[in-house]
């Protein structure tokens, strides 16, 4: 079985992390019947610097034709310190989510009793923690309109969700809750 992997190293520590992740996949490949073909593509600040776009069309094509995306990191201090930047590395991640319909951020939170003593938090708070957080990623504050009124007296940052966006993340969360004794 051959799987095509889009490798989006991104920025900062991304290239270093992706190099090591590919080593892990190569070990898996040697010990299994799965083979991986890697296609590198630009995203974030590296894409802005080379193509003028944080999620260029050729990256979209590679992502769309891949079985999976291996994503490094995104962001660059050059853009963090420029509040007037018209285009930002993070825009590439947001555009990728929208383009590929990656709408769910699923974060399991679990403590292991054998590790509780190493935490700075109280044992009674940590014991038996086991829940999952679901967050919708293609609507809301990330994609809302931002601005300042013409007279400069008001600022706005809208948070809008479509009914369909709320329904699909809710459906996903409710189905997971059914598998977890109705606990998320």
What does each model-identified segment do?
Residues 1-12, 30, 35-37, 45-184:
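Anion-binding alpha/beta catalytic cores of soluble intermediary-metabolism enzymes, centered on
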Residues 13-18:
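Short N-terminal binding/cap micro-motifs at the start of the first secondary-structure element
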Residues 19-22, 75:
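Short, function-defining helix-loop hinge/capping sites that tune catalysis or transport
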Residues 22-32:
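Short catalytic helix/loop segments, enriched in acidic residues and glycine
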């Amino acid at each position: 079985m051959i799987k095509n992997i889009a490798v989006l190293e991104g920025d900062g520590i991304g290239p270093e992390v992706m190099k090591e992740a590919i080593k892990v996949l190569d070990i898996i490949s040697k010990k299994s019947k799965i083979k991986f073909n890697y296609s590198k593509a630009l995203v974030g600040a590296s894409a802005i610097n080379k193509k003028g776009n944080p999620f260029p069309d050729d990256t979209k094509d590679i992502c769309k034709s891949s079985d999976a995306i291996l994503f490094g990191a995104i962001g660059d201090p050059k853009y963090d310190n420029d509040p007037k930047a018209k285009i930002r590395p993070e825009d590439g991640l947001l555009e990728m989510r929208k383009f590929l319909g990656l709408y769910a951020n699923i974060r399991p939170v679990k403590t292991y009793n054998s590790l509780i003593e190493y935490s700075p938090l109280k044992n009674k708070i940590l014991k038996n923690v086991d829940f999952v957080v679901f967050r919708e990623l293609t609507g809301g504050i990330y994609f809302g309109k931002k601005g300042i009124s013409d007279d400069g007296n008001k600022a706005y940052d809208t948070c809008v969700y479509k009914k369909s966006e709320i329904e699909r993340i809710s459906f996903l969360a409710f189905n997971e809750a059914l598998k977890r004794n109705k606990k998320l």
